[in-house]
Amino acid sequence: MELNRRDFMKANAAAAAALAAGITLPVKNVYANDNSIKWDKAPCRFCGTGCSVLVGTQNGRMVASQGDPDAEVNRGLNCIKGYFLPKIIYGKDRLTSPMLRMKDGKYDKNGEFTPVSWDQAFTIMAEKFKKAIKEQGPNGVGMFTSGQSTIFEGVAKSKLFKAGLRSNNIDPNARHCMASAAVAFMRTFGMDEPMGCYDDIEKADAFVLWGSNMAEMHPILWSRISDRRLSKQDAKVAVLSTFEHRSFELADLPIVFKPQGDLAIMNYIANYLIQNNAIDQDFIQKHTKFKRGETDIGYGLRDNHPLEQAAKNAKTAGKMHDSSFEEFKQLVSEYTLDKAHELSGVPKDQLESLAKMYADPNLNIVSFWTMGFNQHVRGVWANHLIYNIHLLTGKISKPGCGPFSLTGQPSACGTAREVGTFIHRLPADLVVTNPEHVKTAEKLWKLPNGVIQTKVGLHAVAQDRALKDGKLNAYWVMCNNNMQCGPNINQERMPGWRDERNFIVVSDPYPTVSALSADLILPTAMWVEKEGAYGNAERRTQFWFQQVKAPGEAKSDLWQLVEFSKYFTTDEMWPAEVLAANPEYKGKTLFDVLYRNGQVDKFQVPADKAGYINDEADHFGFYLQKGLFEEYAEFGRGHGHDLASFETYHKARGLRWPVVDGKETLWRYREGYDPYVQAGEGVSFYGNKDKRAVILAVPYEPPAEAPDAEYDLWLSTGRVLEHWHSGSMTRRVPELHRSFPNNLVWMHPTDAQKRGLRHGDKVKVISRRGEMISHLDTRGRNKVPEGLIYTTFFDAGQLANKLTLDATDPISKETDFKKCAVKVVKA
């Protein structure tokens, strides 16, 4: 076999990734040149980077994968998880039939899981949903969904709940990872999602990572940063975190700060910029406006919690007051070098070096962040503060310069945010609380006025509380494992799931912790077992075709949503006055009015594509995915969210919106790059009516919980390279499981010695909410400072979220998984 340069580079990259994880990589995943294998493209199933892979199928099975050499994102490379993608769908315990808890031939909350037909499953499910709506109103039902759902599934579920069932109680697990970023985008720019793109990496002179371990969580992007750092003279990398991780290995400026200290650091930088005349006055005057945020806003805990009782402005947490540059200058002036050092624990010379990087007018700089910023009781503020720095310097919306929020899931942007599967959102940045936005949605969905409620539903943590309190009685969990991944399992989630008043449905391909805690399990098709679309962190929309069939009776989430709609009629779900005013809708099923409405069902599948598979089209009789997409795309066309045609995406390796006249947009808000910026404007933040971005003055405030005499350590949670989220897919890949089989607790050697502990010891981690048994690591990849431990949540045998606190950012309602107090003893 002849090996060309591209193959050589791919093989070496694959081998390097495997070596980092301690894995032997199958040769077929590197070269995959078997001519009997059929290849087609698909975006990776894992993180928000949006790598494209080539999927190899043979005899109806996925047998190989390789990085897509024609993809701009990853350029033929995959991370170690990507190289083992074929194995995620072939776990020995795949679910192949609906499973209902039964006893003596009928449903019983305490019964054993028993196989049932889809009709039996949907019949009992519809009965429970109708009962909950009759007793509680539309708010008695809810859905917790996902940033891993396809765009088509997102549209279908949003329509089913918000229009069909008239419940805005639908929220994605992106609430736990991207809500703070999304809210801050909207508050600052009037539009969601980053203004830049991955091309910034090759054009930047410096990179600053805030609470982001890109080396393990976004490894392909990290490989591009590494290449830039090593190939460009004087390129710099700064990494900020509460502990040292693998990204520190490349850092020129490695900074470890005290939990919550990032707020003080960023306010110090803003102060430094002003005091040293390193701000762009012209840019500020033309393109920004100043606001002051509400303070003392609480921590998103239950209303009767002492911290909420003491907070002065918990009810108005999101309020912003008109302000001025002088008032902003006065607030940040308090954040001197001494104060920033005191609050953050960072050496003064490091703080000054970081500030000078942002102050250098000749330095193109990109700020990246992920969960360290977002999973934060002041996550919205943290996002605002980094925008402040880029807006003050004018280092934004141009090649190699800008703030860049990275996503953790493959379609947290494309589905959760762009489609709008949050409790308050509709497609293309529309919101349910705006009556005009609601009218637009009803018109585009061909629905009568008055169907969609204008009140925000229950967010993720509030759903847990409502289930526990008996106010939410029918609940559908789709494409996530929230029993394992959500906070405060013991006190706030498990009680509601096992409450006799409630009926819990979980759609999943595997018997996860969530599935086994449910009353009804629906077996789900995975990834290329269905046709789909994702939207990644750089606004890139990517499509793929179905390539294999799901096993047994497993069905896609899209099929489940649309088929379930047949079990309800408008007479049962919609107000009598709406039907009286619109008699043509009376007596129809929700399937008729939502999906067979004359526009979703008007397309047929391509007749000229050999070997084409589409299980949904075969079942429903029309090209469901195309119909849903074209209906959805109308929301954004002409409004700065333009998408290309359906067929275009199947041909391309993704396009970055807005796509106008067939051309994608790399940098938004900048003349010459963004078609919505008019000639002569230079920069236009057109999401806001006045076309100005907000610079927000907010202070440092402490976390919800901190170590004390009894619980004397900080706990931070996160992930490792080898596993993704709850491990329900990656732990079923033998090679990945062997490389990192179980969760660990990383502790500083001095802290271990003080407690009479040693590396490898079995330990018990205890918080005010629960406890977890694990093993101690004082030598591994993560180097934690004294006073803090780090652990992960991929291990179903060690439920780390029994420890975490359900405190949230009061504005975004996103959970802080990075800061709570624990103690550690020998087990």
UniProtKB/Swiss-Prot annotation:
Membrane spanning residue stretches: none
Domain 4Fe-4S Mo/W bis-MGD-type: 37-93
Residues annotated to bind Mo-bis(molybdopterin guanine dinucleotide): 81, 148, 173, 177, 210-217, 241-245, 371, 375, 481, 507-508, 530, 557, 717-726, 801, 818
Top-level class of the enzyme under EC nomenclature: oxidoreductase
Enzymatic reactions: 2 Fe(II)-[cytochrome] + nitrate + 2 H(+) = 2 Fe(III)-[cytochrome] + nitrite + H2O
PROSITE patterns: 4FE4S_MOW_BIS_MGD (PS51669), MOLYBDOPTERIN_PROK_1 (PS00551), TAT (PS51318)
Record's keyword terms, sorted: 4Fe-4S, Electron transport, Iron, Iron-sulfur, Metal-binding, Molybdenum, Nitrate assimilation, Oxidoreductase, Periplasm, Signal, Transport
Binding site for [4Fe-4S] cluster: 44, 47, 51, 79
Cofactor note: Binds 1 [4Fe-4S] cluster.
Post-translational modification: Predicted to be exported by the Tat system. The position of the signal peptide cleavage has not been experimentally proven.
Signal peptide: 1-32
Enzyme Commission numbers on file: 1.9.6.1
Assembly, per entry: Component of the periplasmic nitrate reductase NapAB complex composed of NapA and NapB.
Role summary: Catalytic subunit of the periplasmic nitrate reductase complex NapAB. Receives electrons from NapB and catalyzes the reduction of nitrate to nitrite.
Protein name stated in the entry: Periplasmic nitrate reductase
Organism: Glaesserella parasuis serovar 5 (strain SH0165)
Higher taxonomy: Bacteria, Pseudomonadati, Pseudomonadota, Gammaproteobacteria, Pasteurellales
Gene: napA
